[in-house]
Amino acid sequence: MEFPTHPIQETGKRPTAMLDRNLSYLSLVEVLYGYPIDGVILTTGCDKTTPAALMAAATVNIPAIVLSGGPMLDGFYKGKLAGSGTIIWEARKLLAKGEINYDEFMDMAASSAPSVGHCNTMGTASSMNSVAEALGMSLPGCAIIPAPYKERKQISFETGKRIVDMVHENLTPSKIMTRKAFENAVVVASAIGGSSNCTTHLSAIAKHMGIKFNLSDWQKLGHNIPLLVNCQPAGEYLMESFFRSGGVPAVMKELIKNKKIHTNLMTVTGKSITQNLIKKIKVNPNVVKTFKNALADKAGFLVMRSNFFSTAIMKTSVISKEFRDRYLSNPKHPNVFNGKAVVFEGPEDYHKRLNSKKLNIDENSVLIVRGCGPVGYPGSAEVINMQPPDRLLKKGINTLPTLGDGRQSGTSASP
């Protein structure tokens, strides 16, 4: 039996995509509760599909496996890798500088989507499918197999066979998605340079599983984990290269080697993580790093609190050397930046007034967008992706510190 779910695709559903995640969850729960279904394969892809599926699996608690549709092939523009999402932010800046025209902008954007599949960067789609695998809810290696590859068809077939066995074994999500499994997911998400949206989604999945899990766990468990995957936006490569270098299993083996994740946990295979990862994996050291040659020593999320917000998340893996040198180089206070706050009342106001000379935005300004949270804007929208005014971009200032009460794109390198 096949059945659809509520459709979700971030850019097509903005600003309501987070609400659509919950609608997708509800539609899945109604079908899984309302029909005599013994087990389910949850097909996922773009950003919100995976958390919606895992939330439903947690609520209904019948045998379930997550089967990702897989990322697109690597894209190229003028001989260089073109990552979905990341190249859009780059193209927007080039257009603002006047270095490309609109037709060239569209060519750049189109180059990042060379095939079927979800985003080929380590955006929210690849991050959440990797998290599903880290939780033990996908067959090993499933998350990053490119959509057009024959291996994607093979793992789909294996997933179909396995769900039948899981029904007979009564292997349910509650036996797999334990507290320790969520701890593993945080560590893996940090090591791969995962999307900041993982924090929101994983907390929601845990809540539906009845597990106490909050934002402070992200810093406690993940902040000191090194960046092991050299993929955009935190690195250089894309998902096709990550797959060829062993994918999530390669990262988990390195984490096991350094005793950073729990190994004796049940997975959808009916085996433990250790048993799943017995085979030797051929790794490209340029793509998947070891602890000794990691891209960054600390790649996890920082949880911040202040007198004007209760909690905030910073994705440290995308903070560039240029940004650190410019804003975070005070030897007395290396993680403190002092600057003028420029406040916008929502993304519409930001786009309308960003280039206004009256605001006097300079390189020592902090861009703030407010009114975009769960209450003030539909479902905490993904609209906190801000770039400097055009005149600063033309001077070579490509980033400013930003702050907002909504969410950022998983492909954004905006600090």
Regions found by a protein language model. Give the residues of each.
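A short, small-residue-rich loop immediately preceding and capping a beta-strand
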Residues: 33-53, 64-68
